[in-house]
Amino acid sequence: MSEAIIAKKAEQVELIAEKMKAAVSIVVVDSRGLTVDQDTVLRRSLRESGVEFKVIKNSILTRAAEKAGLDELKDIFVGPSAVAFSNEDVIAPAKVINDFAKTAEALEIKGGAIEGVVSSKEEIQALAALPNREGMLSMLLSVLQAPVRNVAYAVKAVAESKEGAA
């Protein structure tokens, strides 16, 4: 192999390793068998969720995972591999891919990494079942508002009972 090709591949490894280090969530899939239309829809959905999606050679992924400290990911880089990276939302790649896999049976989740910890296919699917960040924040807000609401109802009930007694 020429030195130019080796240098280019080394640069790719560095770039992917940096993406892996920076990502809060990585999902690796086998997209073999998807139609062009399905692939386009999947990529659009991921892009709208702020997720980067790339098909990368396994040899480059393996070396990048080693450099990123995610050695255990090497076991899932068998067969065609596509990787979804998210730097902001932990749940977004898992949720979009898992929802899409329900309609496109050709898409198979292989595994991934969540905040630097290698995760199995089952863990990625469990993560996908969680609500997104906005959903979790609204749940937290409703839990925090409940005691205040209950106090307000109690004060209102006392005020109404005193009005009725007067």
Swiss-Prot record:
Stored Pfam families: Ribosomal_L10 (PF00466)
SUPFAM superfamilies: Ribosomal protein L10-like (SSF160369)
GO cellular component, one term: large ribosomal subunit
InterPro entries: Ribosomal_uL10, Ribosomal_uL10-like_sf, Ribosomal_uL10_bac, Ribosomal_uL10_bac_type, Ribosomal_uL10_CS_bac
GO biological process: translation
Domain of life: Bacteria
MF-aspect GO terms: large ribosomal subunit rRNA binding; structural constituent of ribosome
Entry annotated with the keyword Ribosomal protein: yes
Keyword RNA-binding applies: yes
Disulfide pattern: none
Keywords assigned by UniProt, alphabetized: Ribonucleoprotein, Ribosomal protein, RNA-binding, rRNA-binding
Family: Belongs to the universal ribosomal protein uL10 family.
Known function: Forms part of the ribosomal stalk, playing a central role in the interaction of the ribosome with GTP-bound translation factors.
Complex formation: Part of the ribosomal stalk of the 50S ribosomal subunit. The N-terminus interacts with L11 and the large rRNA to form the base of the stalk. The C-terminus forms an elongated spine to which L12 dimers bind in a sequential fashion forming a multimeric L10(L12)X complex.
PANTHER family: 39S RIBOSOMAL PROTEIN L10, MITOCHONDRIAL
UniProt-recorded name of the protein: Large ribosomal subunit protein uL10
Name of the gene encoding the protein in the UniProt record: rplJ
